[in-house]
Amino acid sequence: MSDTEDQYKLGTSFIFPKEVMNDIHIKSDLGRYRMRGFSLFKKIPTWDDLTFMPGTLTRFVIEGYREKCLTKTIIGPEAPIPLELDIPIYITGMSFGALSYEAKTALARGATMAGTATCSGEGGMIPDERRYSSKWFYQCIQSRYGFNPNHLRLADSVEFFIGQGCKVGLGGHLMGQKVTDQVAEMRSLPAGIDQRSPARHPDWLGPDDLALKIEEIREATDGQIPIQLKLGAARVYDDVRMAAKTGCDSIYIDGMEGGTG
């Protein structure tokens, strides 16, 4: 059998290796998605796929190997106080509960060292995460677990969560074994019990209502910091077109690499 024929054997495909096929079979038996954290079994992009574009006509090269490479990224440039990152990468939202206190604070320290931001994730703010983060997103989610307007005003940017790439349209689910007393206190819910976030926000029904909600958040933050919409990658063209009409400062299209809780 040739190499070309062999790559189409069951379980040897790059897109559908054995782990992916087993996952499909398990979900077909269950009739629903699996209750698990972490990423997909499917092959996904890695850090090795990041590419710096070289100069040609649009970025004319003066002298080889001496050109500056600028990685500064500005989120919400039209906001009175835009969020400036030294690199086009930041630590996305992962809740306290899905991650431990040690992990959250370590990521905050690392993000500060790299000149970039971290995000609270759902469930509210850990004071030490905010203290160690020089640049910090506060995430507003469907369930409003842990939401505190005073913490909102401490943020450098607000991330209004509509969906995430690994489970578009499914809301959130934090397993009971991760709901410690501290997590439960932050979310005003009982410890040791599974906690679910609904798939949609309860106080707006569409893009027009969402625009009003964004104005409400903008008023709460004195109109100073950027407001970002987080969308799971689905009908990207249509979703972005509608999101752009809501008056948000930036739009974040989330891939399927995540899935912490």
Outline where the language-model segments fall.
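Hydrophobic/aromatic residues located in beta-strands of well-ordered beta-sheets
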Residues: 118, 136-138, 227
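Conserved, well-structured core domains of diverse proteins
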Residues: 1-89, 93, 98-112, 116-117, ...
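Short linear interaction motifs
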Residues: 140-142
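Alpha/beta enzyme core
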Residues: 109, 130-132, 144-261
